[in-house]
């Protein structure tokens, strides 16, 4: 059983990839992230197209609640023009939530379905792939730099990274190192927080599934309630992680846009 268990876990943690090493492209991550994005666009565009001023349907109510909630968060936390930030925050939350929610699909269902088409390795949760979360956080990093320059200009950006927190020319090297580390810590923490939580959640589902392979009937039976309890708890995890990624993005961009001089 030990060998079978190790092979089972290793199989479920293997990507469908093209290429080797650093340049390997995880095709399953790309596919499911695109599916999640398309699903978000289709649902929201359909609701917007069919929106009515009369009695709204359940889906329209849900979408309107999410939009108003996100818009309220942006209004409270981003002190600047929010015509771009609110749609960005909404997209981040919904996209990350949908990608996270794929983890609720039984661990063997999608790999076995893919195996019917000759695909032997498949990981369906994009946010459990560090390359995906790093890609999203790098985009946020680019927006941080963009809004910093837009708000303060290149001279303001240079002053911020050379004259803060110690406003003296002698501390320019120290200030630059401290501010650079602080800046780089933002996208890195964004990426690894989301990846770590989703990878751990995926691994726990796999370990619970391993219990069904046990020779002991009691251990097999124990897997059922454990699976149910973890799935219910994981709904909170996937929602919370999507919220945290969105909220930190809003806060980071608000700090970048802040015109107050240090």
UniProtKB/Swiss-Prot annotation:
Keywords: ATP synthesis, Cell inner membrane, Cell membrane, CF(0), Hydrogen ion transport, Ion transport, Membrane, Transmembrane, Transmembrane helix, Transport. One of its GO terms (cellular component) is proton-transporting ATP synthase complex. One of its GO terms (molecular function) is proton-transporting ATP synthase activity, rotational mechanism. The chain crosses the membrane at residues 24-44, 85-105, 129-149, 194-214, 228-248. InterPro entries: ATP_syn_F0_a_bact/chloroplast, ATP_synth_F0_asu, ATP_synth_F0_asu_AS, F0_ATP_A_sf. One of its GO terms (biological process) is proton motive force-driven plasma membrane ATP synthesis. Gene3D superfamilies: ATP synthase, F0 complex, subunit A. It holds the Pfam family ATP-synt_A. It is a multi-pass membrane protein. It comes from the Bacteria. It is found in: Cell inner membrane. Belongs to the ATPase A chain family. F-type ATPases have 2 components, CF(1) - the catalytic core - and CF(0) - the membrane proton channel. CF(1) has five subunits: alpha(3), beta(3), gamma(1), delta(1), epsilon(1). CF(0) has three main subunits: a(1), b(2) and c(9-12). The alpha and beta chains form an alternating ring which encloses part of the gamma chain. CF(1) is attached to CF(0) by a central stalk formed by the gamma and epsilon chains, while a peripheral stalk is formed by the delta and b chains. Key component of the proton channel; it plays a direct role in the translocation of protons across the membrane. This is ATP synthase subunit a. It comes from Haemophilus ducreyi (strain 35000HP / ATCC 700724).
